[in-house]
């Protein structure tokens, strides 16, 4: 009986702390709203690793680009926006955000 309880104690934290793609995405949005940008970036990356082929990744990559842009990581932000465009090539807001970064960096396409 003691062995079963000990086994459950070791397994329970893993289940409690495992988060779904949706939960990570929602927590990332909360962090963005609270201006906890490094934490938001980490949560978005975790969600993307969980489901790399999810169709909603265009939004996650776009949000990641926003976070990285606000952190001043322009090269990373460009890469994130480009990945977002792989999922949604005609998304005008993403195209505009990527163009704005090019302008901020003084680059032309």
Regions found by a protein language model. Give the residues of each.
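Short coil turns that delineate tetratricopeptide repeat
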Residues: 52-55, 89
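Start-of-helix register in tetratricopeptide repeats
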Residues: 22, 56-59, 93
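Register position in tetratricopeptide repeats
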Residues: 33-34, 67-70, 104-105
